[in-house]
Amino acid sequence: VAYQIYPKSFLDTNGDGIGDLRGIISKLDYLKKLGIDIIWLSPIYKSPFVDQGYDISDYYAIAEEFGTMEEFDELLSEAKKRDMYIIMDLVINHCSDQHEWFQKALADPDGEYADYFYFRKGRNGNPPSNLRSYFGGSCWEPVPGTDKYYLHMFAKEQPDLNWENPLLREKLYEMINWWLEKGLAGFRIDAIINIKKDLDFPDFKPDGPDGLAGCWKMVDEVDGVGELLEDLKKHTFQKYEAFT
């Protein structure tokens, strides 16, 4: 039996109005009595929280609102004592615009880190294509001081990561394995179907009065996501027999 916990509203133990890891630890016995085997945590990574923590600015850090890495390690240890498993949300289609990678990309739009994302030149003063983000408005946001745009299928503060770049994939795999080495049992993978893009970024027939077309149309028509997922599995989850 798996149970999802939204840490922000679960249990606040320090009186700041925000639920925390200490609150989850304190309720493990109760959760065990309910028959829960797996606890799935919504995002607890460092984040500006533009999108409830699904905009991650540091994959290796716990948001201070929720506690510390030491408390997270304690949660893993206490759960293990009770034969319970901890899994977390894994958000790797995109990151936060405050992430170090994206900040470096903005500083040098023609450099190495720009290829961690999708930077494209506009078309005749317009965005590279007429894709609409899942949150509304264009999927493309101007890169300040350039004639380029960056792709975001969700909020503009959530630039999409370029899964065609093997160096980017390697960095993500390293991060995933780091958490699994800690003793995390696995991940619930967020928005993963979106990682494969049509690199030509064609226009689609508009489906609304804004002249844009839902970005899901590109996702539906492009092939290759299965190969990317197999590569992800091979280099991470498979080695640890992780839940996904």
Label for each model-derived stretch:
Residues 1-177, 181, 194-244:
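Acidic/aromatic-lined carbohydrate-recognition and catalytic surfaces
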Residues 39, 187-189:
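Hydrophobic residues within beta-strands of alpha/beta enzymes
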Residues 184:
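Conserved protein kinase catalytic-loop anchor
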